[in-house]
């Protein structure tokens, strides 16, 4: 289908499902709304707007369904009724012909499939818009037979994606220029985010690298299993990983009858997430029930099994500090500190007044404290902060929006397993440990150790550099020599002060830790 024909199809779907009312209601051009009313005269729309939007996206195909799923995570931009409805979108499409999958594998490895796998199940076990999964058996480097899951990219996806994305970018430009809410909704930003998301999913080597990183990070935590990646069998269009066997986490009664401790399972999920966030700064960002199973094997009984690593989040130390300090300030009801943190982040316009931002944050956050602490949703706290920040033109970073979406998923899953789950009591030790690591002597020692090779490299060179400098200067220029010696003395005094001050600081912290237990509040 040509781009023009596809554009006509999209316009027809928009009018059929009444999305013109949803979009044009904020347009500043009265004539545009008038023309649309004439075209759609006599149309009856009974369904709510969120349902109509969901059905329209489903009718436009899998790429638009995925776009709706991404929109559902941007609750800082979307009204709640629309975000809730879009969250119901399912990325389910009929599987493509197994012969096509086999041809893709043979093209990737340049040999017959019988030489790649010991056996290959033609019937796919899962299918989505981007890829489908088959089970197979390989021989690893040691010659052992291993059961694997083979993810094969759906052929011909890139041209379709690029065509639909070009239309989305064009429509986003129209909305941003014509709508009164265009700048606030940032449609171009959302489409660009979706563009990156889709192209990341199209690279299965990238997904394999994500899985390998998570597996390495989680090796010391006996709560979660990450499948092994078989790199000899991976390609941009084919991903081969260890086959994992477990029970889907939403089959709670089956897990309970098997003897799994359900409340512990809920707490373990939160522990896994906060370990990935605050210890590793690298987290699985697609933690919906379809990607999580629970092992019933005797040696790994009750552990989580994570699947599908196409979407991950990465946090810097600055991001982690922003999160930790915002959460702790929120639970202290220190709204001024929350406002200051937003301004210190550098994401706020320079003219923003702290007291105005503080008042807005107080208005949004204070009602939470009418309920028990265990009922407070950390994901909703972040969401409300982001929504308030948007009013002040704060540029919320994409990785934090991704984290907020994942946190909401984790909370929802945890409370589905255990309605009495106290998320804050589980998260608090991670925040305390992270704050202690940032403020305590461990951080100073880490920084000194990290810089030691640099100091060791330059210190032996200082006498030679000084000698070379003096030789290059005229012998009668004693003023420069005196100035250099004076500077050297000042530098020596400064270094001594830093060393003595650092030792005093470390000793003071050690004494403080002996007599005072460090707590957030």
From Swiss-Prot:
Residues involved in ATP binding: 125-133, 151
Keywords from the named record: ATP-binding, Cell inner membrane, Cell membrane, Kinase, Membrane, Nucleotide-binding, Transferase, Transmembrane, Transmembrane helix, Ubiquinone biosynthesis
Active site, per annotation: 286 (proton acceptor)
Catalytic activity, EC: 2.7.-.-
GO terms for biological process, alphabetical: regulation of ubiquinone biosynthetic process; ubiquinone biosynthetic process
Record carries keyword Transcription regulation: no
UniProt GO cellular component terms: plasma membrane
Topology in membrane: Single-pass membrane protein
Pathways involved: Cofactor biosynthesis; ubiquinone biosynthesis [regulation]
Top EC category: transferase
Subcellular localization(s) per the UniProt record: Cell inner membrane
Broad class of the protein's primary localization: membrane
Cross-referenced InterPro entries: ABC1_dom, Kinase-like_dom_sf, UbiB, UbiB_bact, UbiB_kinase
GO molecular function: ATP binding; protein kinase activity
Transmembrane segments: 496-516
Domain Protein kinase: residue ranges: 119-497
HAMAP family: UbiB (MF_00414)
Family: Belongs to the ABC1 family. UbiB subfamily.
Described purpose of this protein according to its UniProt entry: Is probably a protein kinase regulator of UbiI activity which is involved in aerobic coenzyme Q (ubiquinone) biosynthesis.
The protein's name in its UniProt record: Probable protein kinase UbiB
Gene responsible for this protein: ubiB
């Amino acid at each position: 289908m040509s781009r023009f024909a596809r554009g006509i199809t999209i316009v027809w779907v928009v009018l059929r499902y009444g999305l013109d009312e949803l979009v044009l209601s904020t347009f500043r051009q009265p004539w545009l709304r008038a023309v649309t009313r004439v075209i759609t005269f006599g149309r009856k729309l009974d369904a709510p707007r969120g349902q109509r939007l969901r059905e329209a996206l489903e009718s436009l195909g899998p790429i638009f369904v995925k776009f709706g799923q991404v929109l559902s995570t941007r609750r800082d931009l979307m009204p709640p009724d629309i975000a809730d409805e879009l969250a119901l979108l399912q990325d389910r499409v009929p599987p493509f012909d197994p012969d096509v999958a086999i041809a893709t594998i043979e093209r990737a490895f340049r040999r017959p499939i019988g030489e790649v796998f010991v056996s290959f199940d033609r019937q796919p076990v899962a299918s989505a818009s981007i890829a489908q999964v088959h089970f197979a058996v390989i021989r690893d480097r040691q010659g052992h037979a291993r059961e694997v899951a083979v993810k094969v990219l759906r052929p011909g996806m890139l041209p379709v994606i690029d065509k639909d994305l070009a239309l989305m970018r064009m429509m986003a430009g129209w909305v941003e220029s014509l709508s009164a809410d265009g700048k606030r909704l940032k449609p171009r930003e959302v489409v660009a985010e979706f563009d990156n998301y889709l192209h990341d999913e199209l690279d299965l080597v990238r997904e394999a690298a994500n899985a390998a990183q998570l597996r390495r990070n989680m090796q010391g935590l006996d709560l979660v299993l990450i499948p092994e990646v078989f790199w000899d069998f991976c390609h941009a269009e084919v991903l081969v990983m260890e086959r994992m066997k477990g029970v889907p986490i939403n089959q709670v009664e089956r897990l309970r009858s098997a003897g799994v401790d359900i409340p512990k399972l809920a707490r373990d999920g939160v522990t896994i997430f906060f370990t990935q966030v605050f210890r590793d700064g690298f987290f699985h960002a697609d933690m919906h029930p379809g990607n999580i199973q629970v092992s019933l094997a005797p040696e790994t009984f009750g552990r989580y099994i994570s699947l599908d690593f196409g979407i991950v989040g990465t946090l810097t130390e600055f991001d982690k500090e922003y999160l930790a300090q915002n959460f702790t300030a929120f639970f202290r009801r220190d709204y001024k500190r929350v406002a200051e943190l937003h301004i210190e982040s550098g994401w706020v316009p320079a003219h923003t007044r702290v007291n105005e931002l503080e008042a807005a944050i107080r208005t949004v956050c204070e009602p939470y404290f009418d309920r028990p602490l265990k009922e407070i949703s950390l994901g909703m706290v972040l969401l409300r902060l982001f929504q308030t920040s948007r009013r002040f033109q704060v540029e919320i970073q994409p990785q934090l929006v991704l984290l907020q979406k994942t946190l909401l998923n984790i909370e929802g899953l945890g409370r589905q397993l255990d309605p009495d789950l106290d998320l804050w009591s589980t998260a608090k030790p991670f925040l305390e440990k992270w704050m202690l690591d940032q403020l305590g002597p461990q951080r100073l020692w880490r920084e000194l150790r990290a810089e030691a090779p640099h100091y060791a490299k330059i210190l032996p060179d200082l006498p030679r550099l000084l000698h070379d400098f003096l030789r290059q200067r005229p012998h009668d220029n004693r003023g420069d020599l005196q100035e250099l010696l004076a500077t050297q003395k000042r530098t020596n005094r400064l270094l001594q002060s830093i060393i003595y001050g650092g030792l005093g600081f470390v000793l003071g912290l050690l004494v403080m830790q002996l007599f005072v237990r460090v707590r957030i509040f």
